[in-house]
Amino acid sequence: MRSLYCGEVNESHIGQEITLCGWVNKRRDLGAVIFLDLRDREGLVQVVYDPDLPEVIKKANTLRNEFCVQIKGKVRARPEGQVNKGMKTGGIEVLGLELTILNKSAPLPLDSNQVNSEELRLKYRYLDLRRVEMTERLRFRAKVTSAVRSSLESQGFLDIETPILTAATPEGARDYLVPSRTHKGQFFALPQSPQLFKQLLMMSGMERYYQIVKCFRDEDLRADRQPEFTQIDIETSFMSSDQVMEVTEKMIRELFQELLDVDLGEFPRMPYSEAMTRFGSDKPDLRNPLELIDVDDILKDVEFKVFSGPANDENGRVAVICLPQGAAKFSRKGLDELTKFVGIYGAKGMPWLKVNDIDAALSTGVEGLQSPILKFLSSDEAIALLKRTNAKTGDIIFFGADQYNVVTESLGALRLKLGEELDLLQGEWKPLWVVDFPMFEEVDGHMHAIHHPFTAPTNLTAEQLEANPVGALSDAYDMVLNGCELGGGSVRIHNQDMQAAVFRILGISDEEAEEKFGFLLEALQYGAPPHAGLAFGLDRLVMLMTGASSIRDVMAFPKTNTAACPLTNAPGKANPEQLRELGVAVLEVKKAEENKDEEQA
């Protein structure tokens, strides 16, 4: 039906007759002459109808925005003074000779001249996707997946599909369950990841596997979360963690170079403990110059118990953030608002100190400083603080003093807030690897895996691990870019005794382990090779690379924040006959109980 895409017409086609198909993006009637901007996936081109063809002009007069049309015409150079340098096809236009209306369009429920609500955009997603911005993002996504496949396949990776209907496994979020008609009362689960299947593929001798795969998690949603999302899933045999990081870093660097013309350079590596101590996050945004600075040793002897208490507690922490030239940026009201903000993360307050004259302060320890806590500090302590933070005139210092996790999380969140709101971010791209994660964390007396229960410890036997699980480090690694976790992976457990030990540490009984993971434990008996892998969030990667504010803007048909689809009205009620065939009964849940479940979640 067409000989060219609209956005591909250029000066080399001048004098040629061509056929175009697309949508009327804009129509301008200048009396005897009608101008159309015709749009397709590749872009826009200007079409001109002049009075020499009255029948065609008559038909063109009936056109409205979003009519779907076929146009035959002759390419010509635009008249002098009418060239549009801001348009890819701005040097030419098409003289319309024939016009076929393929389909008319009703008035659009979306307004292209204003910002439409998220709900409306998702309800009419097929119209929202016609916008150039959305088309470009989906095109870019396709380029990413193509480049990923090319990179991995050039390194010997095989694209192998794994099941979508599988068994439930404890991976941290709720499963989406699918009732079985042939096995009444039993359920499949949609996979939260292909984790166990890709490990089994390594035990099958596949050695290098990848898959661009859908995953499903029934969890509370945020801007970068969806109930169904796409992973770039990778697993290898006979590779160390260093080698896996090299392979996947190479892929990401090639991706940015090819699609964005950006050289990310070599990714630095940072231990988890350093990331938490310096930045208050296991996915630090290195564009932000602010850091958390420990001052426990300076304040452990002050009379102010808010400081000396945590400073002398092995589980406590006293740390500060020094904000350059921040003293004048915050009134008392502004400081109160920041105090409320850190309170969200458990902080009971946020003392502060303004440096009005650093020379006077370093001389006296008192003069040149402004703070409600100044009376609790000796001259030596104040001077030591200023030297530790390298404070200058005009700076402000924010304090955190509490249990280690509270201080780290609250100051880490404050660091991000200040960096974004005060435009402190430096550079466009700052990648890194975070390594040496703890293997477990203890919550309410129970051990939980930081990553997942199939992650191997670093240089420990099963006996050593069970003797001191809290002190164990995992052979895991996360790739972080601009404060977002792009991907995470680890060396896997390939020894049955080690896997059984991890299950015991996590409180999984032998009976439960056999019921849920018996197939894995058995497979580990038959010469399972050392193996490791990593998974990238494709949606998040494309979101970062395109500058989108949400992963919903880089997915064709995403769900809302309530995991619903306004376009198809999913989820919906099932047909009673279908429920009978499945042996499923729907209980009526009162609203109060639903709210209680949400709060507990």
UniProtKB/Swiss-Prot annotation:
GO biological process: aspartyl-tRNA aminoacylation
GO MF: aspartate-tRNA ligase activity; aspartate-tRNA(Asn) ligase activity; ATP binding; nucleic acid binding
Keyword field: Aminoacyl-tRNA synthetase, ATP-binding, Cytoplasm, Ligase, Nucleotide-binding, Protein biosynthesis
Annotated function: Aspartyl-tRNA synthetase with relaxed tRNA specificity since it is able to aspartylate not only its cognate tRNA(Asp) but also tRNA(Asn). Reaction proceeds in two steps: L-aspartate is first activated by ATP to form Asp-AMP and then transferred to the acceptor end of tRNA(Asp/Asn).
Species in which this protein is naturally found: Colwellia psychrerythraea (strain 34H / ATCC BAA-681) (Vibrio psychroerythus)
Pfam family, one: GAD
Record flagged with keyword Transit peptide: no
Family of this protein: Belongs to the class-II aminoacyl-tRNA synthetase family. Type 1 subfamily.
Record: residues binding L-aspartate: 171, 217, 451, 492
Aminoacyl-tRNA synthetase recorded as keyword: yes
Record-marked site positions (Important for tRNA non-discrimination): 81
Protein known as: Aspartate--tRNA(Asp/Asn) ligase
UniProt catalytic activity: tRNA(Asx) + L-aspartate + ATP = L-aspartyl-tRNA(Asx) + AMP + diphosphate
